[in-house]
């Protein structure tokens, strides 16, 4: 049974790598039929749904994963990113803060929090979070690009 599950997850991963997300979902569903509480399958299923623009379904999958492991940092970041896309910035920040409570040096959570804060109109605070993210990982592209964008927005407003 475990071998079959692993094979399904590998096939789903390969399909995602090829951009065949719809077919990958079928494999994740089969994997979850075998092991309904498989956290990896839930997370990857959620990411795949997100890639397809099925954000509410992705959110449900992340919430299901969090019901199994409430403090899973990857799931919290993924849930936050979906909430951000859905323009639920305060809820997204809540997810990123939960990650930062466990790992204050998490560059992704810092940068994503900066993005949500920026969307809420607080560019100086957003810049602060992008800079913190870059202190944790100086090569983090998202933080670098977001920092430059936020600075340009501030400059154009002045």
Model-derived features: where do they sit?
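Alpha-helical segment of the N-proximal tetratricopeptide repeat
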Residues: 3-40, 47-51
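Helix-start (N-cap) detector for alpha-helical repeat units in TPR-like alpha-solenoids
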Residues: 5-6, 39-40, 73-74, 107-108, ...
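Register position in tetratricopeptide repeats
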Residues: 17-18, 51-52, 85-86, 119, ...
């Amino acid at each position: 049974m475990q071998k079959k599950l692993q094979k399904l997850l590998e096939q789903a991963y390969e399909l995602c790598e090829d951009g065949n997300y719809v077919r990958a979902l079928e494999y994740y569903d089969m994997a979850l039929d075998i092991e309904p509480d498989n956290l990896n399958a839930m997370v990857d299923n959620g990411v795949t749904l997100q890639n397809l623009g099925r954000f509410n379904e992705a959110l449900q999958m992340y919430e299901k994963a969090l019901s199994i492991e409430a403090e899973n940092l990857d799931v919290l970041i993924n849930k936050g990113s979906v909430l951000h896309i859905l323009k639920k910035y305060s809820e997204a920040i809540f997810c990123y803060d939960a990650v930062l409570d466990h790992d204050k040096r998490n560059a992704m959570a810092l940068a994503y929090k900066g993005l949500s804060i920026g969307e809420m109109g607080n560019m100086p605070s957003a810049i602060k979070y992008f800079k913190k993210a870059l202190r944790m990982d100086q090569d983090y592209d998202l933080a670098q690009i977001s920092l430059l964008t936020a600075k340009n927005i501030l400059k154009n407003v002045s």
